Amino acid sequence: YDDETELYVPLAISESAELFKKDKEAQYISENNYDFLEESGVINYYKNNDIFLRPSMVSSCSYDIMFASLNAETPLRYDMNYRNYMLVTNGKVIIRLFAPKATKYLYSVNDYENFEFISPVNPWSVQDKYQKDFDKLRSIDVTLVPGQMVNIPAYWWYSIKFVKSNTSVCVFKYKTYMSALSISNHLIMRMLQRQNTKRVIAKRMVSGEANNAKEETETQNT
C-alpha cells in the first residue's frame, strides 16, 4: 500500500481487456466500474433484480462489476456496509476470509479518500515481516462458480483471487439508516479528507506538441 500513488487509474473497457490478456504477472484488477454500468445500461438489471437482496430501511445501494487478470488478487480489506454480496457470473474465484478479531494482526490502513480499509498483508503469499503475526490467524476459503453468491459480513476481512480467465463478479452493497449512523464518525472523516485533498491535473500533450516543445528546448540550450 502506497498513499503517495493513485490506487485507481481509469481505462476504457477495451484497453482493460487487452491489458488483462497481456498480463503475465497477475497484477491488474478492474473495480469501481459504476460509470460503465450506468453508461451501458447494465445498472438497470442490478436495480430491477436485487429486490430480494435489499435490506429494509435501506439508505444507499452501491453496485459494481469486477474483472481481473488470471490469478490476480484483490488487496486484503473489509467493508462497513450492512450487506456485501458477491455474485460470480463467469469464471471462478476463491475468497479468503478473516474474522474481525484478526484486525490487530493485519496492520489496517484507513484510506478515507477512497473509503477503503486495507491491509498491506498479502494473505496468499505472506511477506516475511508479517509472517509471525499471520501465523496466529485462521482463515476460511470460499470458492464461487457462475451462479453462486456470498454475503460478506461487515468488518470481515476478505481477498478475492481470480483463478480463471475472463472471470466477472457482480457486487451489491447496501447501507441502512441505522448502519450509516453507526459509522457516522468514519463518514465524517471521509468528508473532511475529500475537502482537504487538492488535485493538480497536468496538461495533456499530443505527440506533435511534445516534439515541438523538445525542439524549442534544444534551440534554447544551443
Give a label for each model feature.
Residues 1-149, 157-222:
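N-terminal accessory scaffold of Fe(II)-dependent oxygenases
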